[in-house]
C-alpha cells in the first residue's frame, strides 16, 4: 500500500482487508484435506440465512489481494487467511477440472461444481496466484500448476487468445 504514497488509498485497502477478514470468517465452507481449507462465499444473502456459490476466480482474486497486501504490509493475518483460502482450492484439486478440460466456474453449497468458466480470466488469476505464492513461499504450488496446465490446454484447443499474456509470466512455468 505504501508504494502508492496515497494515504486515502492505503486506508481504503486496510478497511477492505478488515471487512474481508470478518466476511470470510462468517461466510465460508470448510474443505477438509491435509491442511484445512476455506472456500469463501461470493456474496452474502440479504437475509443472512442462505449460502451462495464460490466462484474460483473470486476466490483466487481475494487470495491475490491478501498475498499482495502481506507482501506490502507484512501482516501475518493476511498471509494466514490467504493460505487457508488457497488450501480450499488445493484440497479440491482436480475436482475443479471439467470433463472437457476447462475449469468449473463455481462450487455450490451442495458440493457440486458447474457453470461455464470465463475464457481466460480464471487462467490469469491462477497465474497471478502462482506468482504471488512463489514470492511468499519460494516455490510453486503443484495443484495451481495442474489447474493452469488444464486451463491452458483447453484454451489452446478452443482457440482462446489471452489478451494479457504478461500476467504471472515471471513465475509460471507452463507445461502443456
Residue locations for each model-derived region?
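Surface-exposed substrate-engagement region within the catalytic domains
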Residues: 70-120, 124, 130-131
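Conserved small/polar residues in nucleotide/adenosyl-binding loops
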Residues: 168-176
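Small-side-chain structural scaffolding
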Residues: 1, 12-17, 60-65, 82-85, ...
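Structural signature of alpha-solenoid helical repeat junctions
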Residues: 5-9, 58-61, 74, 78, ...
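Flexible, glycine-rich surface segments
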Residues: 45-85
Amino acid at each position: 500500500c505504501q508504494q502508492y504514497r496515497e494515504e486515502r488509498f492505503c486506508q481504503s485497502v486496510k478497511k477492505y482487508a478488515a471487512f474481508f477478514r470478518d466476511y470470510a470468517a462468517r461466510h465460508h465452507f470448510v474443505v477438509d484435506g491435509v491442511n484445512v481449507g476455506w472456500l469463501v462465499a461470493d456474496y452474502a444473502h440479504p437475509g443472512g440465512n442462505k449460502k451462495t456459490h464460490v466462484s474460483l476466480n473470486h476466490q483466487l482474486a481475494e487470495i491475490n489481494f491478501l498475498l499482495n497486501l502481506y507482501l506490502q504490509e507484512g501482516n501475518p493475518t493476511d498471509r494466514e487467511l490467504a493460505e487457508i483460502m488457497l488450501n480450499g482450492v488445493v484440497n479440491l484439486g482436480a475436482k475443479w477440472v471439467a470433463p472437457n478440460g476447462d475449469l468449473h466456474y463455481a462450487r455450490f453449497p451442495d458440493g457440486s461444481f458447474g457453470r461455464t468458466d470465463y475464457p481466460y480470466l480464471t487462467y490469469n488469476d491462477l497465474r497471478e496466484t502462482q506468482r504471488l505464492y512463489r514470492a511468499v513461499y519460494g516455490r510453486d504450488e503443484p495443484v495451481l500448476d495442474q489447474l493452469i496446465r488444464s486451463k491452458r490446454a483447453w484454451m489452446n484447443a478452443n482457440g482462446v487468445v489471452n489478451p494479457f499474456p504478461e500476467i504471472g509470466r515471471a513465475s509460471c512455468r507452463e507445461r502443456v
